[in-house]
């Protein structure tokens, strides 16, 4: 097995103590004293520790095992955005609703008896000494009686770099998941849950070196807001790099991605204006839109027909009651929807923009750096000029391995935000160390040379996304999203399988993120995989084998098989499928791995 192959996580255990000792000794060994026996032994010891350090680097970012495992992420010229929508049989849908019904009934029965025999446990839900409860019984029901059952799957503490593998801090509960205690030991697992799309979150390498240099020069914090004395030269450099990269004339950086969306709309919009939002836009967008005081309309997710219907209605009818025209209309969409794994239909949105003359705001938190031939986001993916987009928003948390967010637009908009946006004027400015990480990541990505490490990461991510998606579909799972998306939602449906899937994958040394209501619709509980450029084919093969085993064990292969491209080869098969008594084909795992590379590169 190659050195970078992912074996069992229990067999990978790099000692942190040895790593620290290695860094203490390395300067001494580079300039050794007289050639004595002790010096030779010390040099041999450091050489061995250096191998351990190199192994640590491979745990964070695996070297590519085959130079052909790269792909350009772009939409074929003239091709319409297409996503095959698969659904389970009615049996699984009914079973899911019945499961929720049983859980709700049991929860109410427990509450009925609990309020009478364990009154102290319900004090916080009732008036207490003149104080009203902060939340009532109904609002708290889901958390107490449903989410509480699978609480051990969420917010698992970790340590170290969220790279190719991640170290989990083991814990246990003695009070039915109300609280957790750490055991003191850790487990190493393949990481398919972090947003580290391009693998820039590393403890070693050019980015880490620049971060260390920035900390030594500037310290850890600016201790001020941008409006006072918290703007360094690094802030200006990163803003200029951001604007150049996304293709807009100016940019503004914020210390947090969530607050970027939460505060930007109150600066741009006002009462009498209108925000039209996709129904699955991120919470930060919804929060910011409500703060703005503008009217808000929602259209069906990625449904351009419904968006046009809303546009025609609001333009013709105007504001409620007065019917006066809206002062301005802003359509807000995301480049890549983080829970669905699909792209916005940007070509059709731009077509509607040219027809109905609204302003366009795109949240590229997950798409910037992750898609497009040069990682330029959704506009780069479709080959559409950013001139068609009025405001581009994004975060540095995902592809850049840092923190914070940005707004990129015309100088007039940026200058207005610079003096009126509360998230910029009053909040702490971005840390110099974070700025150094962003700057070094940008320079890697923007290097257009044939041997560019940044370009390799972008193309590795595109290949990995295709390879995993195709493999899971052929195994029989229902997968949401577009084929080039690095966000891969696998549908579980039944809430009882959320906990089971998480634990079964963890037994096989794989850390996953499971998602349930209210983060997603009640019926479509899911697990969300986020692959990165740090994974190689051995990692993905190990992952697919584990999914195949767990999928069989938990009966998760609901797909019709159409997405796996092996349904309806003959008219008889098509007829059987349409009549509902056709058994979907399932690829064997050996065939999936055998044909996966070729098909991921050619389809």
From Swiss-Prot:
Cofactor entry: pyridoxal 5'-phosphate
Reactions catalysed according to its record: L-serine + hexadecanoyl-CoA + H(+) = 3-oxosphinganine + CO2 + CoA
Function statement: Catalytic subunit of serine palmitoyltransferase (SPT), which catalyzes the committed step in the synthesis of sphingolipids, the condensation of serine with palmitoyl CoA to form the long chain base 3-ketosphinganine.
Localization per Swiss-Prot or TrEMBL: Cytoplasm; Endoplasmic reticulum; Membrane
GO CC, alphabetical: endoplasmic reticulum; membrane; serine palmitoyltransferase complex
Enzyme Commission code(s) on record: 2.3.1.50
Record has Transmembrane helix as a keyword: yes
Entry-linked InterPro entries: Aminotrans_II_pyridoxalP_BS, Aminotransferase_I/II_large, AON_synthase_class-II, PyrdxlP-dep_Trfase, PyrdxlP-dep_Trfase_major, PyrdxlP-dep_Trfase_small
Organism: Schizosaccharomyces pombe (strain 972 / ATCC 24843) (Fission yeast)
Protein name according to UniProt: Serine palmitoyltransferase 2
GO molecular function, one term: pyridoxal phosphate binding
Keyword match Lipid biosynthesis: no
Highest taxon, organism lineage: Eukaryota
UniProt subunit comment: Lcb1 and lcb2 encode essential subunits of the enzyme and form a heterodimer.
Gene3D superfamilies: Aspartate Aminotransferase, domain 1 (3.90.1150.10), Type I PLP-dependent aspartate aminotransferase-like (Major domain) (3.40.640.10)
Family label: Belongs to the class-II pyridoxal-phosphate-dependent aminotransferase family.
